[in-house]
Amino acid sequence: MKVRSSVKKMCDKCRVIRRHGKVMVICANPKHKQRQG
């Protein structure tokens, strides 16, 4: 899980979602998981 101020899709399988008011990226590739902090 990377914590970034700007979350971006890193590949075409990445999905940008909102959970509990936080913007997150979920993906099939675990290296692409990100959340805004």
Swiss-Prot record:
Biological process according to GO: translation
Keyword vocabulary terms for this entry: Ribonucleoprotein, Ribosomal protein
A GO cellular-component term linked to this record: ribonucleoprotein complex
A Pfam family the protein falls into: Ribosomal_L36
Molecular function, one GO term: structural constituent of ribosome
Keyword check for Magnesium: no
NCBIfam families linked: rpmJ_bact (TIGR01022)
UniProt cross-references to PANTHER family, sorted A to Z: 50S RIBOSOMAL PROTEIN L36, CHLOROPLASTIC (PTHR42888), LARGE RIBOSOMAL SUBUNIT PROTEIN BL36C (PTHR42888:SF1)
Family listed: Belongs to the bacterial ribosomal protein bL36 family.
Protein name as it appears in the record: Large ribosomal subunit protein bL36
The encoding gene: rpmJ
